[in-house]
Amino acid sequence: MTLIEDARKGVVTDFVKKAAEYEGIEAEKLIRLISHGYVVLPKNVRREEVQPRAIGMLTSTKVNANVGTSADYINVEEEVEKAIIAQKAGADAVMDLSSGGDLDAIRKRIMEVVEVPFGTVPIYQAARDCHRVVDMDEDDFFRVVEKHAKDGVDFMTIHAGVNWVSVERLRRSKRLLGVVSRGGAITIGWMLHNEKENPYYKDFDYLLEILKEYDVTISLGDAYRPGCIHDAGDRAKYTEFIMLGELVEKCREKGVQCMVEGPGHVPLDQIETSVRAMKSVTDNAPLYLLGPLVTDIAAGYDHIAAAIGAAIAGMAGADFICYVTPSEHLALPTVEDVREGVIAAKIAAHAIDLIKEGQRERARQRDYEMSLARKNLDWERQFELSIDPEKAREIYSRRKSESEACSMCGDLCAIKLVKEAFERD
């Protein structure tokens, strides 16, 4: 019995109770949302301890951090440190996207330090295990999914929405960058070389059988996410939206939790349309977005471009933000890049929660308490309430004022001046 099937029977497990407490909502309300597929609560049956993180309607906006090796840079312990730092900075989930080294050993090592939901993209390993990507057979697509499920992976990105219809849309498109999704590119390359349908799409029911056995949440990958502003909102992307909506229905029918992934690079004026379209065609499935990045020229600062897009997407209904680091488009991120990426995404997530139904009051209470601390010039309380207490404290201490205010205004602190004026009046 999967968690979504339990929810449909009204069963409130201890795990659900903990998740509801974390979200500040009633457990009965949470299981209703899970039962409809509006919220997912990822947890593989083989993982004993996972901090509950509900994703979707009425729940707080969550942040995912990607870690993992590349073929050019394999330092497992650095990736472990990234996973630790990401969680310390507030990441609600961690994904291992390793593509270099002993992928089984790396995945298991990173999982040892991850306490929140843990995700992977299995096709990366399937591709690495073969001499050439196109040499995979159809069974390879599924064997690797089962391997990850047995290892305890809580959620997996699988590009099941790619099929011949969408490939033909891509072929006729005027895209500048084509496909920028690694999983999508692997799948499309395999299809074109072997002249066969995507196994994940063709045998989706079989895929769901594997996932259901371990209660793995499927994250339906967006192979056609736009990789630049020029490519945003084209027919290939919307074709995939529709396919993903149909797959969401199948997931719910089979009792498998699912969420849907989205773009990408999107200009500000298209974000709301894109998000609302995805929410509509997927019947309010939890929406997991990479950014979206609102410009292509922010190299070195793409975490900021992504946070801007994420905040706007959250206003329209996005539920889960995949962080972007300053190294995006440039290099494998460092530990510090990971921390900065999580912080930027957490700022966007909190900004979303300030207006999100079910979370607004709780989120605004924190801002209210910060304002009180500023009114009282209570610096320790301000540090405590900050997204990044360590950095706030370090900056304040860098140039201290002789007054109780900060060194920006010193004895001309506006709050202090007006307060003292009223006290003298």
From Swiss-Prot:
Q: What is the top EC class of this enzyme, as a single word?
A: lyase
* Gene3D superfamilies the UniProt entry points to: 6.10.250.620, Radical SAM ThiC family, central domain
Q: What does the entry's cofactor note say about binding and number?
A: Binds 1 [4Fe-4S] cluster per subunit. The cluster is coordinated with 3 cysteines and an exchangeable S-adenosyl-L-methionine.
Q: In which pathway does it act?
A: Cofactor biosynthesis; thiamine diphosphate biosynthesis
Residues that hold [4Fe-4S] cluster according to the record:
C406, C409, C413
Q: Which UniProt keywords apply?
A: 4Fe-4S, Iron, Iron-sulfur, Lyase, Metal-binding, S-adenosyl-L-methionine, Thiamine biosynthesis, Zinc
- EC id: 4.1.99.17
The record ties this protein, via InterPro entries, to: ThiC, ThiC/Bza_core_dom, ThiC/BzaA/B
Any one of the GO BP annotations: thiamine biosynthetic process
The answer, when asked if Zinc is one of the entry's keywords, is yes
- Catalysed reactions listed for this entry: 5-amino-1-(5-phospho-beta-D-ribosyl)imidazole + S-adenosyl-L-methionine = 4-amino-2-methyl-5-(phosphooxymethyl)pyrimidine + CO + 5'-deoxyadenosine + formate + L-methionine + 3 H(+)
TM segments?
none
- The residues that the entry says bind Zn(2+) are H265, H329
Give residues annotated as binding substrate.
N66, M95, Y124, H159, S181, R182, G183, D222, A223, Y224, R225, E261, Y288
What this protein needs as a cofactor is: [4Fe-4S] cluster
User: Does the entry feature the keyword Transcription, yes or no?
Assistant: no
Q: Which HAMAP family match?
A: ThiC (MF_00089)
Q: Give the function comment from the record.
A: Catalyzes the synthesis of the hydroxymethylpyrimidine phosphate (HMP-P) moiety of thiamine from aminoimidazole ribotide (AIR) in a radical S-adenosyl-L-methionine (SAM)-dependent reaction.
The Swiss-Prot or TrEMBL record describes its family as follows:
Belongs to the ThiC family.
Protein name as catalogued: Phosphomethylpyrimidine synthase
Annotated organism of origin? Archaeoglobus fulgidus (strain ATCC 49558 / DSM 4304 / JCM 9628 / NBRC 100126 / VC-16)
Coding gene? thiC
